[in-house]
Swiss-Prot record:
Component of the cytochrome b6-f complex, which mediates electron transfer between photosystem II (PSII) and photosystem I (PSI), cyclic electron flow around PSI, and state transitions. CDD domains: Cytochrome_b_N. One of its GO terms (biological process) is photosynthesis. InterPro entries: Cyt_b/b6_N (IPR005797), Cyt_B6_PetB (IPR023530), Cytb/b6-like_sf (IPR027387), Cytochrome_b_N_euk/bac (IPR048259), Di-haem_cyt_TM (IPR016174). It is a multi-pass membrane protein. This is Cytochrome b6. It comes from Prochlorococcus marinus (strain MIT 9312). The lineage of its organism: Bacteria, Bacillati, Cyanobacteriota, Cyanophyceae, Synechococcales.
Length: 218
């Protein structure tokens, strides 16, 4: 017991752990806060589940047009609890989108976007866009008929934009047509670019909430 106390004292002297703990655990919660104010936190939990299950699947998934579908089939049928990992990933993705939509509605209806919380709202909107991008890129990774044609349609949408439309289509596809380069880019976006982008904006979002507190009632 004395050893654990001395270890704690060592860290306390250098990092002031107790002050951090007191700040986290003693934050004032306004009396008007109810269960609907937990929707943002539930969205965060869904993201963490997505991260954990997605990381687990990267050990088996092969991002090539010839092996992607078979690797997903192998995960679902031969890997122990692979079906459960992928199913939880898919279910938590749907839950994350639903909780995000409800969270946006709650913030809007309670006026949480108003001054001085405009930047908190902006970071939230950016995270909503990133979440949609997660869905689009993840949908394609099994590289089945549904995934292939979804990518072909989605990546072709920017073609309607004047001047830069064709360039954006080629940037998304990695060439003139949908193929290996497209799958590689979508896989990179889904497993690296988007998660880190979302994590950065989440940190900004939470720090601003921490600084400004929860918005008051209507």
């Amino acid at each position: 017991m004395a050893n654990s106390s001395s270890v704690y004292d060592w860290f306390q002297e250098r990092l002031e752990i107790q002050d951090i703990t007191d700040d986290v655990t003693s934050k004032y919660v306004p009396p008007h806060v109810n269960i609907f104010y937990c929707l943002g936190g539930i969205t965060l939990v869904c993201f963490l589940i997505q991260f954990a299950t997605g990381f687990a699947m990267t050990f088996y998934y092969k991002p090539t047009v010839t092996q992607a579908y078979n690797s997903v089939s192998y995960l679902m049928t031969d890997v122990s609890f692979g079906w459960l990992i992928r199913s939880v990933h898919r279910w938590s993705a749907s839950m994350m989108v639903l909780m995000l939509i409800l969270h946006v509605f709650r913030v809007y209806l309670t006026g949480g976007f108003k001054r001085p919380r405009e930047l908190t709202w902006v970071t939230g909107v950016v995270m909503a866009v990133i979440t949609v991008a997660f869905g689009v890129t993840g949908y394609s990774l099994p590289w089945d008929q549904v995934g292939y044609w979804a990518v072909k349609i989605v990546s072709g949408v920017p073609a309607a934009i004047p001047v830069i439309g064709d360039f954006m289509v080629e940037l998304l596809r990695g060439g003139e047509s949908v193929g290996q380069s497209t799958l590689t880019r979508f896989y990179s976006l889904h497993t690296f670019v988007l998660p880190w982008s979302l994590a950065v904006f989440m940190l900004m979002h939470f720090l601003m909430i921490r600084k400004q507190g929860i918005s008051g009632p209507l």
